[in-house]
Amino acid sequence: FARIEAYKAGEFDFVHENAAKNWARGYIGQKFSNGSLLKTELPNSNAQGMQAFYFNIRRPLFADVRVRQAIGLAMDYEWMNRQLFYNQYKRSYSYFTNTAMAATGLPSPDELRLLQPLKDRLNPSVFGEVPMPPNTNPPNSLRDNLRQARALLAQAGWTYRDGALRDAAGRPFEFEVLLASRTWERILAPFSRNLEKLGIRAKVRVTDTSLYKKRVDDYDYDMIVHWYLSSQSPGNELTFRFMSNAADELGADNFIGLKDPAVDALINRILAVETRDELITASRALDRVLRHGHYAIAHWHNNVHRISYRKGLGKPQQLPDYYHSEDWVVAAWWWDDNPRATASQSKGARAP
């Protein structure tokens, strides 16, 4: 809280807050009560990409899509958001979260024109509803999700006996989550407990930064935390992340180990588009195929900019569509000689 206390003491005039705990518990006190410091949330329309737990499907353990889907069903995001994040996040759902590139519902006719020529390489489910992350909001529940997970694991050849989930050879289901920071341990703890209910042991390994980078560059891990950033116009970065030729290139960004000719074809289509509409269609088709592969367990994102500022700062009534709050404040805010008027004018300042 040192930065927050310095802000309250007047050492600077504006704060963008990333930490949910700080936002919920730190921005309180007399100066907030009397209005000399203001606290607000502004809509965040920036592309979010997808932060997630990513499977390394180079590992035979994760080769079966049913296994990956089952493990994803064990993460109770809604519980995490309530108990750990002060209900301040939204679940991410797409590799292009918060953009027009995110697939929704059934494939559109334009998407089908791209997917049909690839049908022999695609799971038939790709032509159905695009999967959304599982949730535990009523009428759904963790119990139901774990029941579904057990069924998927059984279909994939895993059975529970002698205190663990085991394959046909009797080997227990164990994997390691490689981390570079202990920050993630408290988040992994409830997830690991849920996996234990399935008979799966998830071990957490925290290493120093240099060893972490070496292991990730060498693809020496079962699962990692990563954030694939995205933009409103995806392009060349997709080749390093998801194309087959990047899967065996040490130090590349294909952390999943994905080698899928259908994915390669869709990325090549994205790189060849000539119009915005074609880009949206091809990106949605790619997103659809990736999400049906259950290669990641999606995390969460912040759909607002959490900001606090000193009374007397003026700001434009109209928000930009896409912005980082710190840059916007430096570029467009000002000291106002009539802060009362500015405050009254900006109450409804969210972009239409």
Regions found by a protein language model. Name each.
Residues 1-5, 204-214:
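Short helix-initiation/N-cap motifs at beta->coil->alpha
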Residues 1-59, 66, 70, 75-95, ...:
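Extracellular/periplasmic solute-recognition and catalytic clefts
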Residues 40, 51, 171-181, 202-205, ...:
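Short, well-ordered beta-strand elements
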Residues 65, 146-176:
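Immediate post-signal peptide segment of exported/extracytoplasmic ligand-binding proteins
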Residues 71, 138-139, 143, 183-200, ...:
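Cysteine-centered nucleophilic/redox motifs
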Residues 73-132, 147-150, 182-193, 214-352:
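Detector for C-terminal structural segments
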Residues 123-131, 166-179:
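Short, conserved helix/loop micro-motifs enriched in His/Cys and acidic residues
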Residues 161, 171-176, 193-207, 265, ...:
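A local structural motif
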